[in-house]
Amino acid sequence: MQKKINIAIDGYSSCGKGTLAKALAKSLGYVFIDSGAMYRAVTLHMLQSKVDVNDEAAVVSALANVQVGFENNAKQQSEVTLNGVSVESEIRNIEVASKVSEVAKIAAVRTKMVALQQAIGSNRGVVMDGRDIGTVVFPDAELKIFMTASPEVRAQRRFAELSAKGDVVTLEEIAKNLEHRDTIDASRENSPLMLTGDYRVLDNSDLSKEAQFAMAMGWVNEAIQCI
């Protein structure tokens, strides 16, 4: 039996991390975990509960009532759950997107989510994407990929995604939201997004999904051969 590895995919929002992670997991027969969805689920709970996400004490207090997990839908696709209920659709709206970085930077929130993420990946065979997967969650991951793309490309991708779902947003709103999230993700005190020397960098501004997948699979095969 081929040995399994953990694959960490980090990068800014709307860089295609989830798309690549899902494709790799499906091809390898690994478990895909969208760590960002976990923080979005926590954020959704705060919004539903009328908790001020800028009030750290209030968020920490409400965190005791949050249980985040995953379940497979009818298509055997992993969906994030909030207190036992799938919220895969609800967590993708612009309101959650505009607040998630504020919630995710809180130490108690990250501690709770990281512990869950590490438990999921303890037996290897996991592809997880996020901001701190290779630096904090799986610092010993056999393969770490850092994904990036130009701000213009990222904004266009996000605009297309939200428009397809019927959300009424402007490209300018999305660009500002991405810029705001980038600043918080890179500058927060707890687990900031960071490119370290052990990452493979994948700039997909001008790459097709097929080209990205082929490049990443090459790195996967190299990593497996090294264990």
Model-identified regions with their sequence ranges:
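ATP-binding Walker
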Residues: 15
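ATP-dependent NMP and nucleoside kinases share a basic, alpha-helical "lid"
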Residues: 88-165
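N-terminal phosphate/diphosphate-binding loop that engages ATP/GTP or pyrophosphate donors
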Residues: 27-92
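P-loop (Walker A) phosphate-binding loop of NTP-binding proteins
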Residues: 12
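Hydrophobic anchor at the beta1->P-loop junction of P-loop NTPases
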Residues: 9
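Small-molecule kinase domains that catalyze NTP-dependent phosphoryl transfer to phosphate-bearing small molecules
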Residues: 71-72, 117-124, 131, 135-136, ...
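Walker A/P-loop
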Residues: 18
